[in-house]
């Protein structure tokens, strides 16, 4: 997978290019990341990349020309190898809120270009002409789009074949099936008088599977019940959830 990044602070992305799962994926050529800095597309001696908004108000906007030129170069690089166009994403609080389903959808793209805004944002006309989709990582404001972009890259990379040592890991993550993850345990068998659940020691894979599913359902119902509203539960899940509610004396 190829990801192009438009950012005034490309150095920030060393956090994902040099470390962890994404860093290994890049070394193995499973993931390719290239950055373009709009400052490199300016023509004045100060490398100006911001300008005042029409209508007044506090703050500045990113200048159109350097940003658009950077996007155009990224698009050209994306299509130069095999003619495949990259989908252009603008990280914005006004965008669709990122969830696991969204991550799956985005991971199906071979090429993405992520635009990281700064200041008070970018000219609306640039969004209309250059951006395919807007995405948000939550209902809060950050100083720039770099951290959301890194979050998006990390989440997407888990679905790139070969990035994880075991592909099942991505399928079993929290939210992979719309449910929160079940509890996990490792050694020692007893920690501060708290033992590992006996079913996990049994070696019975079917019982372990059912226990984990029940735990995921219970956690989701207790902590994020709204997630269940959008799920088409299987017969097994409905039965387990009914038993869980009965245990809490709620029908």
Swiss-Prot record:
Q: Where in the cell is it found?
A: Cytoplasm
Keyword annotations for this protein, in alphabetical order, are: Cytoplasm, Methyltransferase, S-adenosyl-L-methionine, Transferase, tRNA processing
GO MF, one term, reads: tRNA (guanine(37)-N1)-methyltransferase activity
- Which positions in this protein are listed as binding S-adenosyl-L-methionine? 117, 137-142
rRNA-binding in keyword set: no
Q: What is its EC number?
A: 2.1.1.228
Task: Please give the catalytic activity noted in the UniProt record.
Answer: guanosine(37) in tRNA + S-adenosyl-L-methionine = N(1)-methylguanosine(37) in tRNA + S-adenosyl-L-homocysteine + H(+)
Q: Name one GO cellular component term.
A: cytosol
Q: Which GO terms describe its biological process?
A: tRNA N1-guanine methylation
Please state which protein family the record places this protein in.
Belongs to the RNA methyltransferase TrmD family.
The UniProt subunit note reads as follows: Homodimer.
Question: What is this protein for, i.e. what is its function?
Answer: Specifically methylates guanosine-37 in various tRNAs.
Q: What is this protein called?
A: tRNA (guanine-N(1)-)-methyltransferase
To which species is this protein native? Haemophilus ducreyi (strain 35000HP / ATCC 700724)
Q: What is the lineage of its organism?
A: Bacteria, Pseudomonadati, Pseudomonadota, Gammaproteobacteria, Pasteurellales
């Amino acid at each position: 997978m190829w990801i192009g990044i438009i950012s005034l602070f490309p150095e920030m992305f060393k956090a994902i290019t040099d470390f962890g799962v994404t860093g290994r994926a890049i070394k193995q050529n499973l993931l390719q990341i290239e950055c373009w800095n709009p400052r490199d597309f300016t023509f004045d001696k100060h490398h100006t990349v911001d300008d005042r908004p029409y209508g007044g108000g506090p703050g500045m906007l990113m200048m159109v020309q350097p940003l658009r030129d950077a996007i155009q170069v990224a698009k050209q690089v994306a299509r130069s190898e095999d003619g495949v166009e990259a989908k252009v994403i603008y990280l914005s609080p006004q965008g669709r809120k990122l969830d696991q389903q969204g991550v799956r959808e985005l991971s199906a793209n071979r090429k993405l270009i992520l635009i990281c805004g700064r200041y008070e944002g970018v000219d609306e006309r640039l969004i209309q002409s250059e951006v395919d989709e807007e995405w948000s990582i939550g209902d809060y404001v950050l100083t720039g789009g770099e951290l959301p972009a890194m979050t998006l890259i990390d989440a997407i990379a888990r679905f790139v074949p070969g990035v994880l040592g075991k592909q099942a890991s991505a399928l079993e993550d929290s939210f992979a099936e719309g449910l929160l993850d079940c509890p996990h345990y490792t050694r020692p068998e007893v920690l501060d008088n708290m033992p590992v659940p006996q079913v996990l020691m049994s070696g019975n894979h079917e019982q372990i599977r059912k226990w984990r599913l029940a735990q995921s359902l219970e956690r989701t119902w207790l902590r994020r019940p709204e997630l269940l509203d959008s799920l088409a539960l299987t017969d097994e899940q409905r039965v387990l959830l009914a038993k869980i509610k009965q245990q809490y004396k709620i029908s």
